[in-house]
Design a protein with these regions (language model features):
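Conserved SAM-binding loop and adjacent beta-strand
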Residues: 1-9
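S-adenosyl-L-methionine-dependent methyltransferase catalytic module, highlighting the catalytic core
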Residues: 84-92, 96-204
C-alpha cells in the first residue's frame, strides 16, 4: 500500500508510538529527531556521536529482516543508481515507512539537483503508484537548495512528493518521457520576458 501523506502526520504517528524502532537512512546532517538509528554512506559518526549511527558501505543494507518498525527515506531514492534494489531493501528491513521525493518541477528548479539526481517521480493517485523515469532537465535551474526550502514552506505540495507505505512500495518505470520530445525552457528567456513585461507595466 502506497499513499500520500505529510511529515506532520508522520510526526504525530511517532508521538503515538514512542516505542518504535525508527531508521532514518540517507539523511546526511538532518536526521529526524525520533530516529533510533541513523544510516548514511558518509561517515557522520562524529556528528552523531550521541546517536546510534551506522555507515553504509555495501549495496545490501546492514540490517536484519523487519528490524525496524518504521524507516524514513527523505530525498534519497532520486540519488540511487539501482533504485529498484534499494526499494526492495526498504521493504525487507521494515513493514512501513515514509518516502519524500522532489516533484519533477522541484527537481528541475534547483541548481544542485542538475547533476546529483538520476530519477524523476510523480505519484499516480488513481493507481496509488509511484511513476519513475530517468531524469530530464527541461528547465534551466535557477534557485539553490536553501531557496527551495523557503519555497517549500508555501508551495510544498508542488515541489515535494510525500508518501507513506505499508508492506510494499508500488512503482512503475515509465520511459515515455524523453527530453528530446520537449523544448527546454530557458531561464534567461523567461527573465527577459519578465523584464519586458515589468518595464511595460511601469511606463503605462
Amino acid at each position: 500500500l502506497l499513499k500520500r501523506t505529510t511529515i506532520n502526520f508522520v510526526n504525530d504517528t511517532f508521538r503515538k508510538n514512542a516505542n518504535w524502532k525508527i531508521l532514518d537512512i540517507g539523511c546526511g546532517y538532518t536526521a529526524h529527531k525520533n530516529a533510533s538509528v541513523i544510516a548514511d554512506i558518509q561517515d557522520l559518526s562524529n556528528f552523531y556521536e550521541n546517536k546510534n549511527f551506522i555507515q553504509i558501505t555495501e549495496k545490501k543494507l546492514p540490517f536484519k529482516d523487519k528490524e525496524f518498525d518504521f524507516v524514513i527515506a527523505s530525498h534519497v531514492i532520486e540519488h540511487v543508481d539501482d533504485f529498484e534494489f534499494f526499494i526492495k531493501e526498504l521493504e525487507r528491513i521494515s513493514s512501513k515507512g515514509y518516502i519524500e521525493l522532489p516533484s519533477r518541477l522541484g527537481d528541475n528548479l534547483v541548481f544542485e539537483n542538475k547533476n546529483d539526481h538520476i530519477w524523476w517521480f510523480y505519484f499516480d493517485d488513481t493507481a496509488n503508484k509511484l511513476i519513475v523515469s530517468k531524469k530530464n532537465q527541461l528547465i534551466d535551474p535557477f534557485i539553490t537548495v536553501a531557496t527551495a526550502k523557503l519555497f517549500e514552506e508555501i508551495f510544498r505540495e508542488s515541489l515535494v512528493i510525500e508518501l507513506a507505505w505499508e508492506e510494499k512500495i508500488d512503482y512503475k518505470i515509465d520511459n515515455q518521457i524523453r527530453q528530446e520530445n520537449f523544448k527546454k525552457i530557458s531561464f534567461f528567456k523567461l527573465f527577459r520576458k519578465y523584464l519586458s513585461k515589468k518595464i511595460r507595466t511601469i511606463f503605462k
